[in-house]
Amino acid sequence: MLKIGKVESYIHEKLKEEKLHFVLLDPEDVSPRLASKLAKISEEVGVDAIMVGGSTGAEGEVLDGVVKAIKENSSLPVILFPGSHGGLSKYADAVFFMSLLNSRNPFFIAGAQALGAFRVKHYGIEPIPMAYLVVEPGETAGWVSDANLIPRHKPKIAAAYALAGQYMGMRLVYLEAGSGAPEHIPNEMIKVVKSAIDVPLIVGGGIRTYEDAKEVVQSGADIIVTGTAIEKAGSLEESKKRLESIINGVKEVSP
């Protein structure tokens, strides 16, 4: 049986007290220097973990450089969010070992995972099994992964996939609208999915403001993820301001 590791235990323990906010940094969009600064700011304002990865699949020295820069400037867990089997770094703490359940391409359901499995084991990275579902509009993530996008007005389809993922042993479910999406996952879909599953629910894509974050958490998200809104804020000061606002929206709803 796959044991629950240090990072996953950290997530579950924190969820007993509050809802969580993760920042996603894409090595193709941020340099190691910028990543280190964003990581430091993230920890200062109360972010709970930093995810590293992207749909177009940064890997090798580019990925390692960003992960190491984050680790050197923050004590937050670094969780890989790979676009494919190449998105692995031995310097990370954990990896969301995810299956994109609504992809038309079996490579993204189990192929990439098979190609990366022994590297995860060899590197000693903690794997966290996760069901990944891409909802309209999907943005780059949907296009690259050939996702059969879940319609925004069909929450039961999302719930069916989410529950299937749970029954297949996934310990997290992630609803993805796509980085830079004009809107976040519909509140009704979040509610329906959350009511169907017993594992933590992550929601990402299109979350830019205090109001967005509060709505998403009130609807049932346990963890929200923001990336584009932080990476492309224009300045470190604006990134910090946006992070503080979003975190306030998350923590205000926490039990």
UniProtKB/Swiss-Prot annotation:
It is found in: Cytoplasm. Mg(2+) binds at D26, S55. It comes from Thermococcus sibiricus (strain DSM 12597 / MM 739). Its cofactor is Mg(2+). Its EC number is 2.5.1.41. GO terms for cellular component: cytoplasm. This is Geranylgeranylglyceryl phosphate synthase. Belongs to the GGGP/HepGP synthase family. Group II subfamily. Its main location: cytoplasm. The lineage of its organism: Archaea, Methanobacteriati, Methanobacteriota, Thermococci, Thermococcales. It comes from the Archaea. GO terms for biological process: glycerophospholipid biosynthetic process.
